[in-house]
């Protein structure tokens, strides 16, 4: 399992999404019709290394939500959803409840950087983007 897949699985635990089919957060792109969700890597790098050699990364991901955005009520409801998702992620951070990563990787922190309307199609579907930031530790393998 990849780090991306682990984060997708973790986000599927948020009960505010209308996943159709259930348990489906796609990679990189949403489906053509709302509601649809996807997750895409957005960069990061090695931030620090501790004295024993453990590495700490900041990895960013774009969570996309394709929702109906044809009128003011739809858009207001969509921002309620985004605020609720951000609040849920903050709660997970406060509780130390993080995605289970493969191998020697573990999550040290999770945060939402921003949430915004990214694009609106001619059919009135809005593509919303939430930037999620993970602080990841890669544990060093002891010699011997």
Give, region by region, the residue ranges found by the protein language model.
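Glycine-rich loop at the start of a catalytic domain that most often binds anionic cofactors/ligands
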Residues: 40
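Charged, amphipathic alpha-helical segments and their flanking helix caps
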Residues: 1-28, 43-144
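Extended compositionally biased segments used for macromolecular assembly or nucleic-acid engagement
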Residues: 32-36
């Amino acid at each position: 399992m990849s780090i991306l897949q682990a984060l997708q699985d973790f986000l599927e635990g948020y009960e505010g999404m209308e996943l159709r089919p259930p348990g489906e957060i796609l990679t990189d792109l949403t489906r053509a019709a709302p509601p649809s969700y996807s997750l895409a890597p957005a960069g990061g790098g090695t931030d620090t290394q501790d004295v024993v050699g453990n590495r700490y990364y900041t990895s960013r991901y774009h969570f996309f939500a394709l929702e109906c955005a044809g009128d003011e009520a739809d858009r207001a409801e969509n921002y309620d959803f985004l605020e609720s998702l951000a609040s849920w992620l903050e709660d997970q951070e406060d509780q130390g409840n993080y995605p289970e990563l493969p191998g020697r990787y573990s999550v040290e922190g999770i945060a939402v950087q921003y949430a915004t309307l990214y694009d609106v199609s001619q059919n009135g579907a809005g593509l919303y983007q939430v930037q999620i930031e993970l602080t990841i530790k890669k544990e060093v393998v002891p010699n011997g």
